[in-house]
Structure formats: structure tokens, C-alpha cells
From Swiss-Prot:
The lineage of its organism: Bacteria, Bacillati, Bacillota, Bacilli, Lactobacillales. This is Methionine import ATP-binding protein MetN. PROSITE patterns: ABC_TRANSPORTER_1, ABC_TRANSPORTER_2, METN. Residues 8-255 form the ABC transporter domain. InterPro entries: AAA+_ATPase, ABC_transporter-like_ATP-bd, ABC_transporter-like_CS, ACT-like_dom_sf, MetN_ABC, MetN_ABC_transporter-like, NIL_domain, P-loop_NTPase.
Length: 359
């Protein structure tokens, strides 16, 4: 097993505001391996942005330990314990290897695209001509070479975010933190930015920490996911595990935003076929991972049990090269045979949720 590039252990972040104490992050531990695109999902106030700001100590934790690239940035075993912290100058150097992009692009309005990207190189040891070449290379990477001398006011939201990405990459970081970077963008532009992030990960091995409230964004680029609520991680796993077998209600809610299966169920419930189920008919959801509900299995229900499957809706996602999907079906046949068919589906690792009928 490879050593994590980011290791957060027992992180607590507590804020004291007048007479209030706010526990923004509560005893969170997380390991992110080199080359991961790690999605951290949660609604506003869940603590996800506070947590990732701990990585480069923009937010110092109240307690816990922060290790990046095998180097301890911070350690305090409890709130009252003596703190060990990396020196200010050393931290400044290490931060150059951790790029960040945000929902608001934080560009300098009075500077051109080229000058905005070059700003990140002001403390670089590169010579002027090397800096110029570096900026040109970055603008080509984010497909903005033709906008080099324009100002932020002349750019679209997506173009501004591309400038921010180029600037974040200027010092050749090993880690890129994306904090709600697509939240202010339209769906088409969001997909373009996500595609760029995926390219950076795949072609350059960039480790990306993706903070978002949009499960669709996670689905597009992440290989691992953690779900946060009230300062805690309530569920984590590979993208495939989270989508195929969500354990928490909040996780299921997020997945619904990326699949719309619940919306399909509510719509189909009102169809005459479902409203007027006959004896021996069941309206059910079949959930599966892999090739377990390919056409021969569905067809075998009729061949082996004389049970027909009327498919009303299907949704299939390919996650980490594995099909994950749901079918909404009406199963019809003799009640005992329908039950036998359901058992057969279960034996083939198909999760069956009966939505109506079968009493």
C-alpha cells in the first residue's frame, strides 16, 4: 500500500464566537493517496471547506495531526496539548506545492491573463524568460493562449476559472485543492472544467481534493468519496462503493441528485400500469453492480418461471469501468413464481426493492 500524500488524523476545529462554541470539524481522519481524485461532499456548513484548509494550515486545527508528503505540518494530541508546527518559512515553501482554486476566481482585475498567472511565480527562482515560457505553457494547457492579453472583465466564468487553474499550477504542485470551483458555473462549463481537472490528474498524476455539494461533479472525476455532515465524515469509500451501496440517508440523497431515480419512481407511480397493478404483479426497483442484470437474466425469468419483466425505466452509470444501474420494472406471473424469481435475482446479487404490490 502506498504512503498517503495527505494524512489527517483526529482533526478537530473549534471556533469560539462570543458565548458560542462552534465545532466545525469533529475528530475527522482521512488518508488521500498520491494520484487520487478525492471528492468530499456535503451541504453548506458541513465543515468540508474548513477541513481542506487544514491541509496547508490556512486553518490551524484545534487538535489532531496533519502530514503532507510524509512531513508533519502540525500535531497536537488534544486541545490543551503542546502543539508542534512546521516553521513559517518552511510552510510557505511547502504551500507552493499545494495549489488551490475556489468558487470565486480571485483574479486581479487590473492585470491581464498572462500577468495573473505570472503573479504566482513572483517568488520563483526561474529567470524572466523561463517565467514567460512557463506562463505560455500553462495557458496552452488550459486552452487560453488566445486570451493571454485580455483582462478578467473580458472573460466568461469558465475562462476565469481556467486562468485560476493555470495560476494554481504555476509552481508545479503535487496537490490541487478545488473548493467549490464549479459552483458558480453553468452545467456545460462545469463539465468542461471537470474534464480539465480529470486530464490534469490522468496525464500529470496530480492529486486532487474536490470539495463540492454536487454529487454529479464527484461522479465525473473522483475515484474516492467522503460524505460530511455536521463536521463529521458519515460515510466514505470508493466511488463505486458509494454509488452502489450507500449506507446513509444523506448519501442516498446526494446520489439521487446525480441519477434522478427517485424522481423517476414518483413519476412512474402515477402511470396506469402501476396504479392499477393486477394480482400477481409487483412494481419493483432492481439495483445492480456489474453485468448482473444483463438481458439474458431478465429473459430467464420468463423462460424459467413464466414471469415477465416490463421495464419502465433504466439508468446505467459506468463508474470506474463498472456498470452500476437501476431498473424500474413490473414483474408479472403466479405469486409463488414471482417470489421464486425474486430469490433468483437476489442470488445473482441484484438488490430488489418492492415499491408496490406483492402483499
Amino acid at each position: 500500500m502506498t504512503e498517503p500524500i495527505i494524512e489527517l488524523k483526529n482533526i478537530d476545529v473549534t471556533f469560539h464566537q462570543k458565548k458560542r462554541t462552534i465545532e466545525a470539524v469533529k475528530n475527522v481522519s482521512i488518508n488521500i493517496e498520491r494520484g487520487d481524485v478525492y471528492g468530499i461532499v456535503g451541504y453548506s456548513g458541513a465543515g468540508k471547506s474548513t477541513l481542506v484548509r487544514v491541509i496547508n494550515l490556512l486553518q490551524e486545527p484545534t487538535s489532531g495531526s496533519v502530514t503532507v508528503n510524509g512531513e508533519t505540518f502540525f500535531q497536537a494530541d488534544s486541545q490543551d496539548a503542546k502543539k508542534t508546527r512546521i516553521g513559517t518559512n518552511d510552510l510557505r515553501v511547502r504551500r507552493r506545492k499545494i495549489g488551490m482554486i475556489f468558487q470565486h476566481f480571485n483574479l486581479l482585475n487590473e492585470r491581464t491573463v498572462t500577468e495573473n498567472v505570472a503573479f504566482a511565480l513572483q517568488h520563483s527562482k526561474l529567470k524572466d524568460d523561463e517565467k514567460k515560457a512557463k506562463v505560455a505553457e500553462l495557458l496552452e494547457l488550459v486552452d487560453l493562449s488566445d486570451r493571454a492579453e485580455q483582462y478578467p472583465s473580458q472573460l466568461s466564468g469558465g475562462q476565469k476559472q481556467r486562468v485560476a487553474i493555470a495560476r494554481a499550477l504555476a509552481n508545479d504542485p503535487e496537490i490541487l485543492i478545488s473548493d467549490e470551483a464549479t459552483s458558480a458555473l453553468d452545467p456545460r462549463t462545469t463539465n468542461q472544467i471537470l474534464a480539465l481537472l480529470k486530464k490534469l490528474n490522468q496525464e500529470f498524476g496530480l492529486t486532487i481534493v474536490l470539495i463540492t455539494h454536487e454529487m454529479q461533479a464527484v461522479k465525473e472525476v473522483a475515484n474516492k468519496v467522503a460524505v460530511m455532515q455536521n463536521g463529521e465524515i458519515i460515510e466514505r469509500g470508493s466511488l463505486l462503493e458509494i454509488f452502489a451501496q450507500p449506507k446513509q440517508q444523506l448519501t442516498r440523497e446526494f446520489i439521487e441528485t446525480a441519477t434522478n431515480i427517485d424522481k423517476a419512481i414518483e413519476t412512474i407511480r402515477h402511470e396506469p400500469l402501476v396504479n392499477e397493478l393486477k394480482e400477481g404483479e409487483i412494481f419493483a426497483r432492481l439495483s445492480y453492480v456489474g453485468e448482473t442484470t444483463d438481458e439474458p437474466l431478465i429473459a430467464s425469468l420468463f423462460r424459467d418461471f413464466n414471469v415477465t419483466a416490463n421495464i419502465l425505466y433504466g439508468n446505467i452509470e459506468v463508474l470506474q469501468d463498472t456498470p452500476v444501474g437501476s431498473l424500474l420494472v413490473i414483474l408479472s406471473g403466479e405469486p409463488t413464481q414471482v417470489q421464486t424469481a425474486l430469490s433468483t435475482l437476489h442470488d445473482h446479487h441484484v438488490e430488489v426493492t418492492i415499491l408496490k404490490g406483492g402483499n
